[in-house]
Amino acid sequence: MISAFEANCDGLVGPTHSYVGLSPGNLASTRNAGEVSNPRGAALEGLAKMRRLADLGLPQFVLPPHERPAVSLLRQLGFSGPDEIVLTSAWRDAPALAAAACSASPMWAANAATVTPSADAADGRVHFTPANLLTNLHRSLEGRQTARSLRRLFADETRFAVHDPLPAQPHFADEGAANHVRLCAEHGGPGVNLFVWGREAWSHWDGRFPARQTKEAFEAIQRRHGAARAVFPQQGKAAIEGGAFHNDVVCVGTRECLFFHERAFEDRATMAREVRAAASGLFEPAFVEVTEADLPMADLVASYLFNSQLLVVPGEDRLVLLAPVETRDNPRAYAVAESLATSNGPIGRVEYVDVRQSMRNGGGPACLRLRVVLTEAELAAANPAQRFTADLQDALADWITRRYRDRLSPADLADAKLLTESREALDELTQILGLGDDFYPFQRTA
């Protein structure tokens, strides 16, 4: 079996990180709308998490923010004039559109794409399909730039295939890896791919909150990637209604372990049976289920226990769960988390990480990263300038401290100076990460 590693590609928080409540069904986003954010603090929190993963011996990469404000969107919607006038006019006449154009949501890289490792793909390459994220306007802007970003990081087409997003049409609504789990005996060996969907394209959905992922989208991605051993369980309707807008709010898995809440799947028994059948002859899945009695949905969503990173750490026999500090601060979630370590199950210990700025918008540690299983050769073929090191951390921390504001209210997003500040910051970042001088739209039109 070829040796492989689960690399984490974390989204770097952008200069316009803010709380404007753009995401129906995301309870934290709605609750904190209107609050003052700290983009500098948020970006530094993200760096600290990346450093912890790197210190544990895990491959770590940095994905750049997207250009925001997205003036091109506002121009498409009828605003004209110099960029600064476009922005101020949009805030005056259509503030909801302007807010969407300013969102720093690409930081949540779990939604960047769905990934199939070379061990599972029909042609032996690593496949990526950037998510179209069409359920919410602010996120629907991301797919094309995400594809560009992934093609810079994984440029070798003999090893990597970065596809275009699926058609931007409701039948193919796709939210990326936040709804995908891969189980396996070893990262380099064959795995079972769980594509978790919320609704079928031709079925009526009458939920209070949107079901963002269609089954048809994941079926198309599975065909496109040639992903072997695919299972298509439905996400629990009760979970979506309770605020689990992606499956990674109620479920996380790696290697043989699937750690999930009892409401994560609409039909838990069928899911388990199909996963076992797909894994037959390869490995025995380990299902670690938490009941509603032990952790009610309200505490689950408040604590984000399952929006943790489940890690295979070199030198450790059991898995490590990297959870947000909100899990530690919630008595019921903390009791569940700590019970994992004292059990004889696959999860041996829990660490806690502070990503509060992201959490206030409904994004825990798992939201901030895209997992990519890579062999040694594939790892070596990735853009080395984006590989997280102590030197890169120092360079990015200096850049963030110089370029980012430490206070940003929703009203501040209308400041034309923020547009200039953001572009100057991103222009410098392209040099730090070796992205070239044509990475962002403003660079290509200068």
Curated annotation (Swiss-Prot):
Protein role: Catalyzes the hydrolysis of N(2)-succinylarginine into N(2)-succinylornithine, ammonia and CO(2).
EC number assigned by the record: 3.5.3.23
Pathway: Amino-acid degradation; L-arginine degradation via AST pathway; L-glutamate and succinate from L-arginine: step 2/5
GO MF annotation, one: N-succinylarginine dihydrolase activity
Keyword terms of this UniProt record: Arginine metabolism, Hydrolase
Transmembrane segments: none
Name by which UniProt lists this protein: N-succinylarginine dihydrolase 2
Gene: astB2
